[in-house]
Amino acid sequence: MAKKKAFIPFLYLASIVFLPWWISLSCNKSLKTWITNSWNTRQSETFLNDIQEKSLLEKFIQLEELFLLDEMIKEDPETHLQKLRIGIHKETIQFIQMYNEDRIHTILHFSTNILCFVILSGYSILGNEELLIINSWVQEFLYNLSDTIKAFSILLLTDLCIGFHSPHGWELMIGYIYKDFGFAHNDQIISGLVSTFPVILDTIFKYWIFRYLNRVSPSLVVIYHSIND
């Protein structure tokens, strides 16, 4: 009976790890058809941000130049304009299809992530007892470590996450999350998050050391500052 009770938190922890993947896969399959039909049946206006509008205009200009060059070389001047209009019309339809697919992709990923967050939040609330058991195990494990190992681990973690060499890693991670929600890549927003988010984390971490560790384990704080210096 005791072994069974000890196994339940491990099962709960494994379910938390694999549940987001399962929710994402299930929601993508179930919501894709509904979102696609809903998007295609509505007479929605086309909203483009500055990046999408600039990219679309560049594609049209490149397309027009390529068609003009190609048709002027191969055909007589009297016929190349007609083929130019036909070619641009076909490419315009392809651009519209690409835009619709991109919008559907954005809505699908955003809806899936929100739904996944809601389900995981409810799952965590329902599994509060298992989380308390896992938390007690983690605290017991950390308590058995020496202050030197704790200080080294804290220093290593902070250097990896909020050190001077971490911006590239933050850029990749924020870019991945930004893309996972289906948003168009925006260097300005990503750069702004990379330059501010680690600074906020660093401030919170230093405040945590000052308020919590100074009270719980002053020797750990002394060792941490000694290693850091």
From Swiss-Prot:
InterPro entries, alphabetically?
A: CemA
Give the species.
Carica papaya
State the UniProt keywords alphabetically.
Antiport, Chloroplast, Hydrogen ion transport, Ion transport, Membrane, Plastid, Plastid inner membrane, Potassium, Potassium transport, Transmembrane, Transmembrane helix, Transport
Known role: Contributes to K(+)/H(+) antiport activity by supporting proton efflux to control proton extrusion and homeostasis in chloroplasts in a light-dependent manner to modulate photosynthesis. Prevents excessive induction of non-photochemical quenching (NPQ) under continuous-light conditions. Indirectly promotes efficient inorganic carbon uptake into chloroplasts.
Q: Membrane-crossing residues?
A: 6-26, 114-134, 189-209
Show the HAMAP family listed in the entry: CemA_PxcA
The organism's place on the tree of life at top rank? Eukaryota
Give a GO cellular-component term: chloroplast inner membrane
Q: What membrane topology is annotated for this entry? A: Multi-pass membrane protein
Q: Which GO terms describe its biological process?
A: potassium ion transport
Record localization? Plastid, Chloroplast inner membrane
Query: GO MF annotations for this entry?
Result: antiporter activity; proton transmembrane transporter activity
- Per the UniProt record, one Pfam family is CemA
The catalytic activity, as recorded, is:
K(+)(in) + H(+)(out) = K(+)(out) + H(+)(in)
- Assigned protein family: Belongs to the CemA family.
The name this protein goes by in its record: Potassium/proton antiporter CemA
